[in-house]
């Protein structure tokens, strides 16, 4: 079964254009499932014919017994379903044992976001006197102005940014490309960063194609972006639950709050499905309800 798993992971990477992070998550989830299947079979060799609905349900029950969160169980069940569908298409399985297998019901969590004033405080936090402070301001402004995922920001190359038009070409999930819009303040922050970036890159002798570099002249990583956001959150006293992705949530919520069309927001976020974007309409509706309940005399 290891070869069948390896083939599925290759399929995800090469044919589905899944990111390395996605492939790694599938691998970890399915390796755990295979370990459970082997233990449950008590030493018998794991063959495709032994992948039964009963075995898969036993795996789900075990996940519940181990105390995993509903989101984790849902993700792992989804990984098994996807693998079984692939095995059926390949002819390895005659019937899909995962048909009808459903993860636990999960109440949709509303995305956490910052108010416009809090975003302004966070974006103003980096010092303007140091190259890294200038970089950090450009990072935060770009994340919020364009609604980028962190991986899209760290993967951004100089040749993909047009400062004259205020456009950047970013590569999102599934390696799909889209145009991201950069507002005036983000453009100004980027120009200030690019003016000092070259000196930092040359000083380290490791000039990069990346827009954003670390202090060693290498491409900035997602982990580094997380750390710098955490640092400035602490400085201005904002909710510690905030992450770089919160700026993307804030971008979408503020657009809708100010009258943007949901289809336009979908395109700007790079969502393949409108249903993914619609979670932000729930956020704005929730805020309206809260305001109504606080202000209306008969609420």
Task: Tell what function each PLM region has.
Residues 1-299:
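Conserved catalytic core of the tyrosine transesterase superfamily
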């Amino acid at each position: 079964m290891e070869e069948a798993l390896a083939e599925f992971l290759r399929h995800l990477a090469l044919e589905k254009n899944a990111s390395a992070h996605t492939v790694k998550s599938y691998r970890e989830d399915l390796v755990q499932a295979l370990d459970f299947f082997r233990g449950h079979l008590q030493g018998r060799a794991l063959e495709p014919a032994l992948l039964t609905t009963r075995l898969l349900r036993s795996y789900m029950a075990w996940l519940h017994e181990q105390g995993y969160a509903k989101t984790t169980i849902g993700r792992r069940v989804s990984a098994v379903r996807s693998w079984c569908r692939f095995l059926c298409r390949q002819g390895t399985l005659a019937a899909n044992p995962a048909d009808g297998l459903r993860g636990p019901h999960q109440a949709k969590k509303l995305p956490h976001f910052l108010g416009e004033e809090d975003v302004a405080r966070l974006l103003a936090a980096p010092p303007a006197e140091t190259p890294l402070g200038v970089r950090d301001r450009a990072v935060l402004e770009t994340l919020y102005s364009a609604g980028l995922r962190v991986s899209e920001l760290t993967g951004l190359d100089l040749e993909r940014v047009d400062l004259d038009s205020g456009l950047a070409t970013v590569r999102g999930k599934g390696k799909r490309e889209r145009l991201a819009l950069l507002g005036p303040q983000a453009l100004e922050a980027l120009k200030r960063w690019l003016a000092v970036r070259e000196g930092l890159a040359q000083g380290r002798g490791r000039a990069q194609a990346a827009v954003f570099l670390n202090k060693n002249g290498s491409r900035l990583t997602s982990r580094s972006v997380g750390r710098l956001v955490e640092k400035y959150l602490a400085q201005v006293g904002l909710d510690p639950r905030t992450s770089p992705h919160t700026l993307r949530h804030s971008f979408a919520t503020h657009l809708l709050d100010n009258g943007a069309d949901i289809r336009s927001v979908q395109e700007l976020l790079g969502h393949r499905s409108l249903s993914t974007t619609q979670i932000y309409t729930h956020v704005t509706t929730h805020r309206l309800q809260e305001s109504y309940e606080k202000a209306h005399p008969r609420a």
